[in-house]
Amino acid sequence: MARKEFRYRGYTLEQLMNMSLEELARLFPARQRRSLKRGLTPEQKKLLRKIRLAKKGKYKKPIRTHCRDMIILPEMVGLTIYVHNGKEFVPVEIKPEMIGHYLGEFAPTRKKVEHGAPGVGATRSSMFVAVK
């Protein structure tokens, strides 16, 4: 079965790539639309500049950023961006389905707790269990 072509609100990826930031903002949900309407922060502009250089092949290093509040735009599709999660940089491969989301959504800041076995004396009944 053929894979269905990606569309965002009825527009193909090529059409989204040709849109200006203002036209694109109209398609996004309210939170992202308001964020783009206020303008990009200097950190976001710097990241966008690196992304554009990487697309042209002029930026060789991996793109690393602390800018978790950057909205994923169509021009980022296909790149791998390393997003900081508070401890390390997590690689995030940008796919078309991620357009309109924030970078931080794909780099979780909290780890799932993995408890070990309870120790001796952890409960009242384990006080009388022989220690190995």
From Swiss-Prot:
Q: Does the keyword Metal-binding apply?
A: no
GO MF: rRNA binding; structural constituent of ribosome
Gene Ontology biological process: ribosomal small subunit assembly; translation
Pfam short name (any one):
Ribosomal_S19
Q: Keyword set for this entry? A: Ribonucleoprotein, Ribosomal protein, RNA-binding, rRNA-binding
Q: Per its UniProt record, what InterPro entries does this chain match? A: Ribosomal_uS19, Ribosomal_uS19_CS, Ribosomal_uS19_euk/arc, Ribosomal_uS19_SF
Its cellular-component GO annotations read: cytosolic small ribosomal subunit
KW rRNA-binding (keyword) present: yes
Family named by the database record = Belongs to the universal ribosomal protein uS19 family.
Q: What does this protein do?
A: Protein S19 forms a complex with S13 that binds strongly to the 16S ribosomal RNA.
Quaternary structure annotation from Swiss-Prot or TrEMBL: Part of the 30S ribosomal subunit.
Know the name of this protein? Small ribosomal subunit protein uS19
Look up and give the organism this protein is from: Pyrococcus furiosus (strain ATCC 43587 / DSM 3638 / JCM 8422 / Vc1)
